[in-house]
Amino acid sequence: MKLRGLYAITDSQLLAGRFLTHVEAALEGGVRLLQYRDKSDDAARRLREAQALQKLCERYGTELVINDDAELAARLGVGVHLGQTDGPLTPARALLGRQAIIGSTCHASLDLAAQAASEGASYVAFGRFFNSVTKPGAPAADVGLLAQARGQVKLPIAVIGGITLDNAAPLVAHGADLLAVIHGLFGADSAQEVTRRARAFNALFAS
């Protein structure tokens, strides 16, 4: 399974009132990986929304991962993305099986990436690369890290943090496999603009 292209991440506040329409618009433009990210404690709504996203992803051939909730991922039979505060990846791999996509937040640390690889990660995520609305205090990373990671970590590399169409191209040029985008995709005013942005992000991988 090749993980390369646009990695769309949902934001429940940003997408309030237009959640499924804007997500489907992104999928229409081409999304390799979709992460359902919701930090609320409304388990019933989270299950409902995740199930709706799963149906959309199946329709468009997109892989779905759940943020920070391996149990919900297991219930749906999808992947999971874990941060550094979520514990080791090994239990999630045991729960979800060998084929599941499991991603790991590595901030700007090659050591964390190596550890994630040893614990069975499917991809590693570095960032923030630019000022981020979602995680303004996250450790900063730069393109030099990508060159080092390419030589040391034999996994797909996701990049995150303030990524827009104006700043994404150098990240792809320096070895990023997945552009993880929230506001730069879903901050659009219309569903049509979301689709246009998704296509434009994917075009960066074709050049």
UniProtKB/Swiss-Prot annotation:
Pathway: Cofactor biosynthesis; thiamine diphosphate biosynthesis; thiamine phosphate from 4-amino-2-methyl-5-diphosphomethylpyrimidine and 4-methyl-5-(2-phosphoethyl)-thiazole: step 1/1. GO terms for biological process: thiamine biosynthetic process; thiamine diphosphate biosynthetic process. Transmembrane segments: none annotated. GO terms for molecular function: magnesium ion binding; thiamine-phosphate diphosphorylase activity. Keywords: Magnesium, Metal-binding, Thiamine biosynthesis, Transferase. Its EC number is 2.5.1.3. Mg(2+) binds at D68, D86. 4-amino-2-methyl-5-(diphosphooxymethyl)pyrimidine binds at Q35, Y36, R37, D38, K39, N67, T105, K135. Its cofactor is Mg(2+). NCBIfam families: thiE (TIGR00693). Belongs to the thiamine-phosphate synthase family. This is Thiamine-phosphate synthase.
